[in-house]
């Protein structure tokens, strides 16, 4: 205490100290020999002065509630972000969607691609023109021979050659079989995603029969590598055309059964009519092709407008939709399968005899029988399969009407035996870009129907 008095500068009885936290000087009073502070008159006078009254600004303030519970604040409601896929069974491969949902209503749909990217276009630059062919089987792995057909036509255009008539008819025949394969997969898996399981089992049995045709003609069920620059790999085996005829005759009955199940089904119509509507103008602006374009009412089919091989010698109709919704696209695919049966029947009736490869030893390999008797044939065979053939310098863009749309190949040659650049135009890439536009404003369950009607395969989208 003496130190405290010395600090304050007083030696009297009542030294003044500062009360902690008050900023007011307090007297120290002696009591029973112990010095402690007690309030006195002088200390109380320090608090005299004006009294603060509530101003007009604070007069409208409300007192706190009697139970000391704050009233609920206005909460900010945000849309839910949902990751759809890539392991979702309706994602048709490795599709990942980042969707913004308001309840069950889709406000935004952002596709994320690249999960199946394999660098196909770069790998092709390190292969000969023949070795690059199997890569195309693995792009759209549901319509294999159509991819081969586009690449073979591009190489033939650079080489300035034309395959024999029989080879062209075989190409058209298997191109339409491939279209049936693709549309069966598209329609039945679309129905399976929406809850209709029966068409999937019925039509996949027919699909197995067409895989047998693939196997009998090339040795492989899927990745055939059958259509090659200059023609096709080998001729049709005996009895195959008869079996294709029997199959096509029975397949129309399967299509009738499919339509009995789906076309007038109330649930199917409710899930597809006015879902994913695309107008003709929007379809053109997004770069749609194939069924996605024809379903919106635009009659555009490269087999009619820019015929290749012998499509100018066959008769068929191009079905178009009127509303541009999922139901119209379903009807277009079913009718395209019927038109493919018409084309298959014409191919079987008009199939000419003759060679199946171009008669140029520098491009197409010789027959096995000739290699046993001719040294030149053996040399040509060895050079073709080791070094490949040189393609004159140039560039070409060749497109065909694949089952999913316009499948294009932009091929650049520098005069060597390997492509300098091969750019692949996949139809599903543009269709996936329109998914946000098509699904906005629909329910979450309708996104599955829209993905199914787009018929997307990620081998060609990611490449």
Swiss-Prot record:
Recorded GO MF terms: 4 iron, 4 sulfur cluster binding; metal ion binding; NAD binding; NADH dehydrogenase (ubiquinone) activity; oxygen sensor activity; quinone binding; ubiquitin protein ligase binding
Symmetric dimethylarginine modification, residue list: 118
Keywords from the named record: 4Fe-4S, Acetylation, Electron transport, Iron, Iron-sulfur, Membrane, Metal-binding, Methylation, Mitochondrion, Mitochondrion inner membrane, NAD, Oxidoreductase, Respiratory chain, Transit peptide, Translocase, Transport, Ubiquinone
The EC number(s) this enzyme carries: 7.1.1.2
Cofactor binding notes: Binds 1 [4Fe-4S] cluster.
Subcellular location: Mitochondrion inner membrane
Family per record: Belongs to the complex I 49 kDa subunit family.
Protein name: NADH dehydrogenase [ubiquinone] iron-sulfur protein 2, mitochondrial
Gene that encodes it: NDUFS2
């Amino acid at each position: 205490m003496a130190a405290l008095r010395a600090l304050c500068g007083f030696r009297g009885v009542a030294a003044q100290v500062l009360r902690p936290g008050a900023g007011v000087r307090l007297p120290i009073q002696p009591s029973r020999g112990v010095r402690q502070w007690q309030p006195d008159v002088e200390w109380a006078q320090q608090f005299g002065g004006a009294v603060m009254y509530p101003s007009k600004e604070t007069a409208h303030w409300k007192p706190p509630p009697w139970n000391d519970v704050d009233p609920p604040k206005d909460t900010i409601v945000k849309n839910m972000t949902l990751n759809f896929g890539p392991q979702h069974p309706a994602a048709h491969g490795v599709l990942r969607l980042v969707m913004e949902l308001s309840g069950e209503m889709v406000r935004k749909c952002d596709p994320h691609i690249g999960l199946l990217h394999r660098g196909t276009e770069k790998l092709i630059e390190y292969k000969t023109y023949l070795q690059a062919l199997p890569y195309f089987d693995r792009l759209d792995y549901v319509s294999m021979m159509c991819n081969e057909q586009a690449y073979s036509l591009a190489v033939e255009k650079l080489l300035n050659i034309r395959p024999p008539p029989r080879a062209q008819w075989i190409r058209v025949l298997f191109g339409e079989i491939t279209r049936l394969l693709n549309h069966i997969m598209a329609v039945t898996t679309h129905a399976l995603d929406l809850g209709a399981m029966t068409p999937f089992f019925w039509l996949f049995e027919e699909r197995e029969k067409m895989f047998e045709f693939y196997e009998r003609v090339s040795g492989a069920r899927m990745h055939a590598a059958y259509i090659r620059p200059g023609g096709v790999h080998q001729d049709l085996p005996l009895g195959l055309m008869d079996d294709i005829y029997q199959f096509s005759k029975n397949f129309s009955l399967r299509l009738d059964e499919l339509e009995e199940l789906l076309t007038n089904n109330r649930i199917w119509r409710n899930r597809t009519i006015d879902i994913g509507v695309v107008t003709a103008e929007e379809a053109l602006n997004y770069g749609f092709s194939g069924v996605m374009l024809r379903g919106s009412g635009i009659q555009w089919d490269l087999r009619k407008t820019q015929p290749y091989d012998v499509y100018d010698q066959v008769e068929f109709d191009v079905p178009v939709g009127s509303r541009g919704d999922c139901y119209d696209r379903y009807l277009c695919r079913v009718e395209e399968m019927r038109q493919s049966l018409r084309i298959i029947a014409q191919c079987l009736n008009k199939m000419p005899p003759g060679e199946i490869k171009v008669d140029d030893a520098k491009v197409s390999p010789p027959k096995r029988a000739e290699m046993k008797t001719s040294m030149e044939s053996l040399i040509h065979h060895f050079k073709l399969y080791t070094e490949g053939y040189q393609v004159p310098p140039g560039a070409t863009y060749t497109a065909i009407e694949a089952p999913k749309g316009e499948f294009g190949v932009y091929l650049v040659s520098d005069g060597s035996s390997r492509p300098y650049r091969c750019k692949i135009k996949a139809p599903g890439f543009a269709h996936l870009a329109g998914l946000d536009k098509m699904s906005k404003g629909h329910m979450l369950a309708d996104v599955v129907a829209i993905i199914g009607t787009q018929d997307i395969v990620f081998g060609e989208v990611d490449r």
